[in-house]
Amino acid sequence: WAKAGFRWIVNDAEHTQWEGFYGRDQNAIKGRLGLLAVQRLHREAISSYGDAYQLGARATMRPYGCTFEDAKIFFKSINFPEPGSPTPHDRGGYPVRNGDRTMNFTPVELRASETETQGWIQFETSEYLIDRKLRDKILQLMVAQGRNKACGFVGPLDVILRQGEIPEVNEAINDFFREATKLGIHTGRVVGSGSMEDPKDIEEGMVEAIKNGARLLSVHPLTSDMTLRGAFEMAAPFFRASKRCGF
């Protein structure tokens, strides 16, 4: 994957349950190859977000948010509490071992041990994409997390599933990219689908997203499909040659 140019991989525990929870070994392998490990979790998750960081994921993804409170709880769940003002959703404290086998036994050491992590919010419901007022409020919450600490990612399938084929979805997505870019927030989307398989169409979709400010672009096939798709690609010349020869 890394040699093909991929830079981040999402492990989807929202829809694949335990198979989608990557452990220390899988995350370490990706980290050594320069791949950002993004752990997507089920919408009910709270404690699991902090646990994912301890297992080596460097980013976590919150799907299907519909309210400002959903986003607020997510960012609480990936951060340790502020001294004197904890909430029920903050990460809990426990001794954590560093890669060099040293331990972090104090709150100061614990906070200092983990700085290069991100929280990704998925903008994939009509509440987050179509409702501009709520969207902008969440973007401001993301800004408050600090530079490069929060990213936004669009999966438009859920909007269409919930609302139907509404014409304003694509413009709402592009407007989201533009507004987030003004605030210094990195955003992205899946480009391609079962009804959009032509590489030329996918390329045009990626160009449109990039021009509107998106920087985190994802292909639509699952990584588990890459071997099959690669095999099809390698076998294709044989079948074209056979057809030309009358077989």
Where are these regions (language model features)?
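Conserved anion-binding
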Residues: 58, 62-148, 153-161, 246-247
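Catalytic cores of alpha/beta
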Residues: 3, 44-58, 62, 69-74, ...
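Alpha-helix N-cap and loop-to-helix initiation/capping positions
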Residues: 66, 133, 165-172, 201
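Alpha-helix-loop-beta-strand connector modules within alpha/beta enzyme cores
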Residues: 18-51, 77-88, 92, 98-100, ...
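Glycine-rich, proline-tolerant flexible connector loops at the mouths of alpha/beta enzymes
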Residues: 2-26, 62, 152-171, 221
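Active-site-proximal loop/turn and secondary-structure-junction residues that shape catalytic pockets
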Residues: 15-17, 43-45, 64-66, 123-127, ...
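C-terminal active-site rim and adjoining tail of enzyme catalytic domains
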Residues: 190-247
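Hydrophobic faces of well-ordered beta-strands that scaffold small-molecule active sites
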Residues: 9-11, 37-41, 59-62, 119-123, ...
